[in-house]
Amino acid sequence: MNKKLIISDLSLAYEEKNAVLANIDLDINGSEILCLLGPSGCGKTSLLRAIAGFENINSGSIIKDGTCISNNLENTPVSKRNMGMVFQDYALFPNMDVNSNIAFGLKGIPKKEKNERVEYLLDLVNLKQCNQKYPHELSGGEQQRVALARALAPSPDMLLMDEPFSNIDEEIKEELVSDVRDLLKKLSITTIFVTHDQYEAFNIADKVAIINNGTIQQKGNPYDIYHKPVNKFVADFIGLGVFLPIKNVNDIDFEIPLGMLDNQKIQHDSFKDKNIEILIRPDDIIHNDSSNLKAVVKEKQFRGAEFLYKLLYNEKYPLLCYAPSHHNHSIGESIGIELDIKHYVIFEK
């Protein structure tokens, strides 16, 4: 598969400050959606700005379609990169209606062709009924669709999106994220998407790069990022979970406070004579009232179809557990649980 963008050994630092990004290696295939995911201040937006051409890099290179567009000596202007940009705050012109906002970037083409392009984009983002409205008359989701249509208007071959759903109400966010993914796939446009929200990333991305302190911690598909984190930062940042100590009973058997582990799933030589612990996610604990293994409910969060229970086992070990919401247990109640770990995620302490 052709590489649309290749980033090699990229570093970026602002004057008199430590490196914002260091030794970034990343690539994205044509038509792929890549998400840059990490906590606030980790460097993900700086990387997006460097790709767009807004920031000069100190070392390394960015190659697009086989041509270098950034290194420490040259920086192809933003306007020459053929990239569309969707900003966090939408950046719509308040004095222009939807039609005019979308048409803003369509310079030097006949009016008839421009109108046809705007009409096509309005239909694409399902906003034909809003074409004469002004930004203040639109919902957050509608404004985001206008911003997306405007970014797509000049027919870029790559789209950059910076926290595009951060200002969207939660009740419509899931549908909007799904709609945007469907649209990007329909257009087969290569997209790089920045967010701090793992659920957005998992819902929209083909590939995810986890960034922390200016470096890439892990990259891969969402499934592997969740089930096979390469370090404790990724394990902690992605999803919910707790760590429990592992005791090496003998050369082949391993035990945690909840019971014995399947020694066939453990690389014995890698962990011999080491102080190790295992990640236990809520889906590794099954609620079973008939189980002899009991834990006390310390907190609970109602999530509609289910509860997230925060438990304490043996007065010492915190656990998390999902249960259908018709199992409405009280704080302080002792409930039955079972251990059902499908993926062993083990790290040294």
Predicted stretch roles:
Residues 1-7, 11-23, 72-76, 110:
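A short, flexible loop at the N-terminus of ABC-type nucleotide-binding domains that lies
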Residues 34-35, 85:
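Short beta-strand immediately N-terminal to the Walker A/P-loop
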Residues 37-39:
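The feature captures the beta-strand-to-loop junction immediately N-terminal to the Walker
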Residues 52:
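Helix-to-loop junction immediately C-terminal to a conserved catalytic motif
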Residues 58-61, 213:
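Conserved coupling/switch loops of ABC nucleotide-binding domains, chiefly the family-specific signature
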Residues 60-71:
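Conserved ABC transporter NBD signature motif
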Residues 82-84, 92-233:
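ABC ATPase nucleotide-binding domains
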Residues 241, 252-349:
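Non-catalytic connector elements of ABC transporters
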